[in-house]
Amino acid sequence: MLIPRRVKHRKQHHPGRSGAATGGTKVSFGEYGIQALSPAYVTNRQIESARIAMTRHIKRGGKVWINIYPDRPLTKKPAETRMGSGKGSPEWWVANVKPGRVLFELSGVNEEVAREALRLAIHKLPLKARIVRREGGE
């Protein structure tokens, strides 16, 4: 699971999800990638689940890059607790994903295998996404 080792502040404000991504919008490491089309908080468990789905499908070939990191804590108060008396304790770690952001990249396999692996990973994520291919003259 992806979790920060140390954080300066244990509890943070919820990050805004409006607007498009300004960086990380192109496939830069691999040949194929997953690009977000809608905003969402992606938890560390969802990232790990998508990674496992991809690596199981490509078996031993290929390489996977994870371009997002869950660096924001989301808090939750216990069940049947009255309102007030402070903010709840951190429950999950999330990555704030904005539209246009490339989440995962993949290379080293042929196109059919890559597309199927990325399709399986998209189903594990709580957002709309598409499969993109690297641009440029490689």
Swiss-Prot record:
InterPro entries: Ribosomal_uL16, Ribosomal_uL16_bact-type, Ribosomal_uL16_CS, Ribosomal_uL16_dom, Ribosomal_uL16_sf. Residues 1-16 have a biased composition (Basic residues). The keyword Cytoplasm does not apply. The keyword Kinase does not apply. Residues 1-24 are annotated as: Disordered. PROSITE patterns: RIBOSOMAL_L16_1, RIBOSOMAL_L16_2. Keywords: Ribonucleoprotein, Ribosomal protein, RNA-binding, rRNA-binding, tRNA-binding. GO terms for biological process: translation. GO terms for cellular component: cytosolic large ribosomal subunit. One of its GO terms (molecular function) is tRNA binding. PANTHER family: 50S/60S RIBOSOMAL PROTEIN L16, LARGE RIBOSOMAL SUBUNIT PROTEIN UL16M. Part of the 50S ribosomal subunit. Belongs to the universal ribosomal protein uL16 family. Binds 23S rRNA and is also seen to make contacts with the A and possibly P site tRNAs. This is Large ribosomal subunit protein uL16.
